[in-house]
């Protein structure tokens, strides 16, 4: 798929997995979409599975953004305590788009926790609380 086609899908609000080898244009396409969202004042969470990847996109780790840290599971009490944290509550409830770069470095358990957190904060049974989710990465580039 060409970058223009991917960008059209992103602008249409579709959930998208961008993949390709190094230099394929994943980051370029993400940055174009991020600029598009920011110009329209759409709240976007720019995250990555690693700190280095997050800083390259002026974002933060998905673990920090979602408030999951290094946890493997979250109880109802954990979620209630998380909702009491003003900063976490505001950005999780306001987010309309979630971008996760270097998805291949994120364990499925952590992705499930992000889903659990967003469903709780958005008070929705939809996947990821119903927000648009864009993941990018190359599963052939595993450690």
Report residues per predicted region.
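Conserved ATP-binding/catalytic motifs of P-loop helicase motor domains
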Residues: 1-143
């Amino acid at each position: 798929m060409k970058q223009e086609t991917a960008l059209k899908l992103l602008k249409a609000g579709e959930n998208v997995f961008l993949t390709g080898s190094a230099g394929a244009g994943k980051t370029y396409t993400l940055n174009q979409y991020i600029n598009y969202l920011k110009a329209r004042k759409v709240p976007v969470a720019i995250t990555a599975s690693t700190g280095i990847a997050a800083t390259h996109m002026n974002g933060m780790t998905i673990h920090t953004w979602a408030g999951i840290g290094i946890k493997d599971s979250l109880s109802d009490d954990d979620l209630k305590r998380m909702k009491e944290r003003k900063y976490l509550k505001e950005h999780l409830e306001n987010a309309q788009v979630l971008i996760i770069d270097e998805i291949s470095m994120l364990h499925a358990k952590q992705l499930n926790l992000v889903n659990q957190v967003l469903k709780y904060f958005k008070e929705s049974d939809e996947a990821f609380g119903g927000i648009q989710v864009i993941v990018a990465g190359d599963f052939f580039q595993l450690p």
